[in-house]
């Protein structure tokens, strides 16, 4: 199997690409049964049985690997501290390492932390992997799922195409390799760290907010945007990740896209009326194929090694006039987007798996090169958990 890395190229050399999910699970489990279930979940997802190779011309591919390197570790460490430590340690995707799992075994259950490099998939991919693991743990036989990556359908506007042609023409064509990625991690993380703030909206409060949103003609994501920018001044440009699975498949692979909404909070109106105004803007973007596929098409049309260079510019591990200019244009350096949101909505996986029950999920998105604060949202058992992942300097 050989699958080219195209529209997910921007994730390849990014130094902050780890998606995190924590699952609270009720039900007695042994370490042996858990390791077996993890191995089965890895085995049934094609992408986790690949590794990433970079060819001499700079093109990159997922290729089959007989020895997947994703692993599960039983630990007594605090899982929040584990996440902070592990995001700074590069995943060896060239060896097939996409997922690191850490588990606290507790009386009557477990706390499971899944960390996945974005090259292994998007947020929903990690959610579906957890489903596979829990199904296997509950005694079910898993079905094999082929790798699936984004297939954008929209078109770029003439101005964007002209910008891309200009940068592609000026680019020197330098090819980067995994040792360059090692250097990027060293350069980036030597004086940086991230923090995560967690807020839980209980079932009653979540239901109340959703009902008020319904009355106002807004959805929960629009409400969250209004809530987050309520105390800011001027127009705010908020990034929004979105699922790009046209056929609703449950395969692992990066099938996410993104858009943004610009809005100035109106203090003369209620938060729900502001949410309704934001919703109108969002609907216009979400209904436009060109808008929804814009970032995928833009990054996928640039020369692949130029995309790598932009990420290395952000990390402080490479500098070139062409890549520096593009990095600034895209917000990888200089003025980056202050706020981005990924709402996985109500987790579309079962809650009960044989004798095991999923109690709570916490989702933390990566603070990618083009963002400072990333908000992750997911609802399970009626409770909504909101995380705010911030990049700070040490």
Regions found by a protein language model. Name each.
Residues 121, 134-138, 214, 228-233, ...:
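Hydrophobic/aromatic-lined pockets within catalytic cores
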Residues 46-84, 102-104, 141-182, 235-263:
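Small-residue-rich loop/turn and linker elements
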Residues 1-9, 19, 120, 124, ...:
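Non-catalytic, low-complexity flexible loops and terminal extensions
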Residues 14-33, 95-113, 185-247, 383-384:
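Gly/Ser/Thr-rich phosphate-binding loops and adjoining beta-strand/alpha-helix segments
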Residues 35-124, 128-131, 135-138:
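Acyl-thioester-dependent condensation/acyltransferase catalytic cores
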Residues 122-130, 221, 271, 275, ...:
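Short, charged, low-complexity patches
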Residues 1-58, 79-99, 233-394:
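Acyl-thioester-dependent acyl-group transfer interface
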Residues 36-37, 131, 211, 226, ...:
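Generic recognition of well-ordered alpha-helical segments
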């Amino acid at each position: 199997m050989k699958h080219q890395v195209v529209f997910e190229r921007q994730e390849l050399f990014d130094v902050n690409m780890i998606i995190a999910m924590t699952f609270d699970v009720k039900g007695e489990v042994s370490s042996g049964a858990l390791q077996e279930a993890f191995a089965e979940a890895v085995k049934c997802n094609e992408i986790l049985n690949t590794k990433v190779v970079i060819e001499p011309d700079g093109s990159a591919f997922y290729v089959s690997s007989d020895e997947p390197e994703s692993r599960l570790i039983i630990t007594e460490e605090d899982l929040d501290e584990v996440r902070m430590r592990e995001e700074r340690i590069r995943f060896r995707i060239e060896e097939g390492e996409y997922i690191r799992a850490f588990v606290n075994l507790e009386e009557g259950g477990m706390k499971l932390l899944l960390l996945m490099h974005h090259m292994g998939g998007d947020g929903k991919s990690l959610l579906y992997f957890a489903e596979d693991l829990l199904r296997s743990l509950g005694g079910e036989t898993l079905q094999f799922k082929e790798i699936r990556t984004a297939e954008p359908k929209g078109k770029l506007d003439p101005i964007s195409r002209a910008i891309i042609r200009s940068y592609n023409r000026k680019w020197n064509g330098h090819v980067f390799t995994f040792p360059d990625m090692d250097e990027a991690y060293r350069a980036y993380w030597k004086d940086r760290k991230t923090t995560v703030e967690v807020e839980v909206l209980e079932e009653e409060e979540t239901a109340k907010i959703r009902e008020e949103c319904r009355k106002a003609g807004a959805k929960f994501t629009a409400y969250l945007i209004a809530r987050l920018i309520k105390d800011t001044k001027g127009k705010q440009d908020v990034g929004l990740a979105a699922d790009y699975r046209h056929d609703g498949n449950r395969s692992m692979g990066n099938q996410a896209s993104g858009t943004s909404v610009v809005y100035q909070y109106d203090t003369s109106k209620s938060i729900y009326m502001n949410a309704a105004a934001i919703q109108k803007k969002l609907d216009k973007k979400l209904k436009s194929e060109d808008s929804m596929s814009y970032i995928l098409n833009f990054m996928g049309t640039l020369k692949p090694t130029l995309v790598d260079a932009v990420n290395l510019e952000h990390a402080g591990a490479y500098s070139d006039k062409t890549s520096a200019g593009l990095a600034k244009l895209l917000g990888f350096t200089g003025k980056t987007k202050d706020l981005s949101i990924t709402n996985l909505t109500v987790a579309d996986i079962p809650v009960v798996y044989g004798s095991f029950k999923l109690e709570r999920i916490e989702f933390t998105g990566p603070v990618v090169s083009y963002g400072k604060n990333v908000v992750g949202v997911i609802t399970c058992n009626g409770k909504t958990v909101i995380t705010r992942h911030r990049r700070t300097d040490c």
